[in-house]
């Protein structure tokens, strides 16, 4: 019990909260539970340990990121700005 065809794991909420919310939860959780690329070894082996904590199962690298994604939009912007500043030097 707890799964449905349309909303997957968000089916655990049953008829509560409405379809839109349950679809959003299902979408976020499906991406969150996927394996992501490691920033150290570049393998698809990063799994979520806890809220904002991510660990690579191959190289053991542990790092912080977003609650649902290992890299947030803000992190991408900062990384791009740093890279650009280093190139200008």
Curated annotation (Swiss-Prot):
Gene3D superfamilies: 2.20.25.30. Binds 1 zinc ion per subunit. GO terms for biological process: translation. It holds the Pfam family Ribosomal_L37ae. Zn(2+) binds at residues 38, 41, 56, 59. InterPro entries: Ribosomal_eL37/eL43 (IPR011331), Ribosomal_eL43 (IPR002674), Ribosomal_protein_eL43 (IPR050522), Ribosomal_zn-bd (IPR011332). GO terms for cellular component: ribonucleoprotein complex; ribosome. Its cofactor is Zn(2+). GO terms for molecular function: large ribosomal subunit rRNA binding; structural constituent of ribosome; zinc ion binding. A zinc finger (C4-type) spans 38-59. Keywords: Metal-binding, Ribonucleoprotein, Ribosomal protein, RNA-binding, rRNA-binding, Zinc, Zinc-finger. NCBIfam families: eL43_euk_arch (TIGR00280), PRK03976.1 (NF003058). Binds to the 23S rRNA. Belongs to the eukaryotic ribosomal protein eL43 family. Putative zinc-binding subfamily. Part of the 50S ribosomal subunit. This is Large ribosomal subunit protein eL43. It comes from Methanopyrus kandleri (strain AV19 / DSM 6324 / JCM 9639 / NBRC 100938). The gene is rpl37ae.
